[in-house]
Amino acid sequence: MALPKHKKSKSKRDKRRTHQKLTAPNVVSCPQCGDPKLPHHICPSCGTYKGRTLIETD
């Protein structure tokens, strides 16, 4: 099994890990009710998408 010949510094390790971060989800407000929702998804509170009611909610 391969082993490293020299120890990698913490800065080299951290530079390699810079692309492994998580991104926060892009949240927009629903134009009908104003509640937060994910873009290109049905609003969970009012059930509308692109101005049409797709799911009946109470």
Swiss-Prot record:
Q: Where is this region: Disordered?
A: 1-26
Q: Which domain of life is it from?
A: Bacteria
Q: Is the keyword Plastid in the record? A: no
GO terms under biological process: translation
List where Basic residues composition bias occurs: 1-20
Cite a GO CC annotation.
large ribosomal subunit
TM segments? none
What's in the keyword line of the UniProt record? Ribonucleoprotein, Ribosomal protein
* Molecular-function annotations in GO: structural constituent of ribosome
> Which NCBIfam families does its entry note?
rpmF_bact (TIGR01031)
Name the protein family: Belongs to the bacterial ribosomal protein bL32 family.
Protein name per the record: Large ribosomal subunit protein bL32
Gene that this sequence comes from: rpmF
